[in-house]
Amino acid sequence: MSKKPVALIILDGFALRDETYGNAVAQANKPNFDRYWNEYPHTTLKACGEAVGLPEGQMGNSEVGHLNIGAGRIVYQSLTRINIAIREGEFDRNETFLAAMNHVKQHGTSLHLFGLLSDGGVHSHIHHLYALLRLAAKEGVKRVYIHGFLDGRDVGPQTAPQYIKELQEKIKEYGVGEIATLSGRYYSMDRDKRWDRVEKAYRAMVYGEGPTYRDPLECIEDSYKHGIYDEFVLPSVIVREDGRPVATIQDNDAIIFYNFRPDRAIQISNTFTNEDFREFDRGPKHPKHLFFVCLTHFSETVKGYVAFKPTNLDNTIGEVLSQHGLRQLRIAETEKYPHVTFFMSGGREEKFPGEDRILINSPKVPTYDLKPEMSAYEVTDALLKEIEADKYDAIILNYANPDMVGHSGKLEPTIKAVEAVDECLGKVVDAILAKGGIAIITADHGNADEVLTPDGKPQTAHTTNPVPVIVTKKGIKLRDGGILGDLAPTMLDLLGLPQPKEMTGKSLIVK
């Protein structure tokens, strides 16, 4: 008996917008896509911003898109998750933060807040520091000290003064907090085992060692005079009139490290939390019985409390198909192979039982605008053989071209990329329909829909435009207002499988 496969076909970087100028999707000759769009139920999905777990207005990307598609739910990235917690009041109820604050109140000790002092949003966000200051004031914590790591990398190289001034205004507004040390991220956020750098930051915070200044802005001005900008500012100590440090980290203090990205937070965290630390001599005043809080899970090696614990993605589409004994195929060329495997499975490398994978090599060319068809024809040929062999109940396929060629910001090659994919799409969908199967044709984010700026310059970034979804089954109706997290529930619906509770997305098929 022949299988009737349900195929999820992802046209990477293929979104829709009305304006045709600079729009390779609109300008391409794509008879197959147009035929399916006209003949079958269709709608559009939001693939950016909070709909995929990113900050509102932020463009989607392939990793985030495939995570959301496979998970069948919104997968919140750390920055967004914390922003939402602040907005909805959950941040102020966080048990780990409250425990740290109770610890210092019970011991009559100090709370130290350290992290990257910018709104770059890559490693940290200064608004999270402000939320902690506000919470400390609300909880009646009196001694709150800030150890600011200066950025200059994810933001401009001489932006520290504006962040320090803004922080000083917040300190005044909340009536709590003092800046105790400043250090360029080169020292405090090293990740390359340059322990001499980390040691300088540590000794400033614990021993009050390093250049001293009465005023944080004076520290920055002095560095700038010597041609040393934010990222490289030497770990420096802010002192009172009598020359003593505003604060050093001592026994029974609490630390909240408000960076959310782990890689550059691990070394300095290990310096404070590891009993077996051997990288440099921490000296006689190394603080004991610290209550150390990481904003997110940094590493197994960091012995601290975690404020926002990782969310495990259980019951992704691949796992559910496997649990029901269905055979599934994941297929893509090199550029998007991790996306249909690792990211589609919620960050899991191993295959599920009953899952097969086909990797087609991407062409070896300097840039893909030189070969806009990439390996789409080879992917298609390999897939047509598998459809013919009647092996799979479910297929997940990615065509990389609209995204990878779209990144060139060149219109003509991107039009050719879309046309090549359309030709392949026609062959695959018609083969699936011939078997009595169903195709879900969609995309993960925009790109090829906007490859020129209004003044004709290359536009190489992703877009925030809606992506299409077509379900090649007549007699059904699709609802509007969907998100990428609704695709897995739709696929399960078409396969007649129950949706697990972890999948909070909803089938697009109107019942």
UniProtKB/Swiss-Prot annotation:
Could be inhibited during sporulation by acidification of the forespore, thus allowing accumulation of the spore's large depot of 3-phosphoglyceric acid. The active site is at residue 62. Mn(2+) 1 binds at residues 403, 407, 462. GO terms for molecular function: manganese ion binding; phosphoglycerate mutase activity. Changing residue 62 to A: Loss of mutase activity. One of its GO terms (biological process) is glucose catabolic process. Keywords: Glycolysis, Isomerase, Manganese, Metal-binding, Phosphoprotein, Sporulation. Very sensitive to pH. The enzyme activity rises 25-fold between pH 6 and 8. Changing residue 128 to N: 5-fold decrease in activity. Pathway: Carbohydrate degradation; glycolysis; pyruvate from D-glyceraldehyde 3-phosphate: step 3/5. Mn(2+) 2 binds at residues 12, 62, 444-445. Pfam families: iPGM_N, Metalloenzyme. Gene3D superfamilies: Alkaline Phosphatase, subunit A, BPG-independent phosphoglycerate mutase, domain B. Its EC number is 5.4.2.12. It is an enzyme of class 5 (isomerase). Binds 2 manganese ions per subunit. Addition of manganese increases the thermal stability. Changing residue 12 to N: Loss of mutase activity. Essential for rapid growth and for sporulation. Catalyzes the interconversion of 2-phosphoglycerate (2-PGA) and 3-phosphoglycerate (3-PGA). Belongs to the BPG-independent phosphoglycerate mutase family. This is 2,3-bisphosphoglycerate-independent phosphoglycerate mutase.
